[in-house]
Amino acid sequence: AANGAQKFADDDSILAIGGSCLTSCTAAMLPITGDAEMPQLVVSSSAKSLTGISDYFFRMAVQDAAVGPQIANQFTKMGKTKAVTLYCNNDYGSGLKDSFNAQFEANGGQVLDSVPYQATDQDFAAILTTVKSLDPDCIALCGTTTDGALIIKQARQMGIEAPIMGQPGLYSQNVIDIAGDASEGLLCSGVFVAAGADEKGQEFVTKYGEKYSGEVPDGFAALAYDQMYVLADAAERAMKENGGELTRQTLAEALKATEYEGVTGTVTFDDNGDWVRDYLTLTVKDGKYVLYEE
């Protein structure tokens, strides 16, 4: 990632970077792109630790520090008081676990246990046996799409009935394909759901389906779609204000003033370059993702 960032930074014809995907890759790139005064706009690097590394960092990603509390608050609204947290034992999973646990306990709930697993695990019988013995009334799932789907499937097979809620990566057709009927009732955080999209969002859903053989876009697809338009919008405004010229610096200044109506909401950035916003709660109903209704 660092080598790629340096290559882009050294090429004066490249004015901005869209990405990277993983927090670890973005962290390696930011000092380089920052020194080069090159705007870097991400949609999926979510760790709080990235904030403040570079004045040229902009983030549309759903952030760990906000998602954990959202999951906790959702369970509290549902009257849940006893949680178990299952988390992938990496920076992402640990950060999400910590933010969930802190908020759930602040709400008056009890975290019975926080149980780690490895991203490469496929058999979760051991940790799910622990979960079942603790008898929680809710489960916070802090991992990624594939491991999350396997945990959901195996938990239901073992008779664990507590509601499960996780991060935006669980809004994926892959989860339903892997977990099957066990995905019914799953809750997850998100910024977009095809079934609840407005007119602009529905137009995107239709075009996406036409392009990709009927596939339904998930939240990451919607964010990436908006990402490109946010960059284009900023470039257009910067050129208008600077006699048709566009540089990395003027593009960055335009990004700071962004107020773009996208399919995922109105995109704006705070002083740290973060998009501070509310998140949706999604659920699987009749095999499809929809907005959760209280």
Go through the PLM ranges and name each one.
Residues A1-E294:
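Extracytosolic ligand-binding ectodomains
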